Amino acid sequence: IRIFMPRYGNINERRHQLHEVIRLSGMNLVVNDVDMPLIIKVASIPRERIQVYFIDNDEYFKRKATFTDEEGVLFPDNDERAIFFAKGVVETVKKLNWVPDIIHVHGWMAALLPVYMKYFYKDEALFANTKIVTSVYGQSFDGNLDMELMNKVSFDGIPAEAIKDLETPNYENIIKASVLHSDAVIVASEALSPSLTKFIESSKKPFLPFASKDKFAEAYTDFYKKMLL
């Protein structure tokens, strides 16, 4: 197991002993026709023996707040941060030459990863047998990300008809795009909207209904084994 997450500016690097991995850093990722430097930092969860890889870029992730400014307004570049994160994760996995059995997506910031895996990285032999699972949570933000998100994703050669949900890039539509391009879905919240619940059921994807805290570990393991591995 390896964990990948953005290196948000409110993460204390000294306390969590993050350090840059030079051999993984240094490449540029193109986001909306602009080269953005990728920095990879790593820390570990010693008791669990799990490595955590932090996808970093000064312009996208140095700010102290996570998704919104002091007024609670969404950052205008959240869409580009999501594109950068999706590409950054896959490029890092490629550099590690690690073959994941499952990529498990959590949260809307990672929701474009299944889209990029199915189109932008479709010819990567490393991922030929990798399955993608999306965990769906309740409403995470109000309003829309940048209305140009669909065009920015299309710039990477992803067909517009595959991402038509992103025409209105609200939370629910971004999650729908993730579900559509995943191999399976896990309902991770009791607070899903009826429309999102209906969408998951109608997607014909294998899905695991919500499981309580005392049961979810066993439920996830069984789901992985039966549906994916």
Feature map (PLM): residue ranges:
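Catalytic cores of nucleotide-sugar-dependent glycosyltransferases that transfer UDP/GDP/TDP-activated
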Residues: 1-229
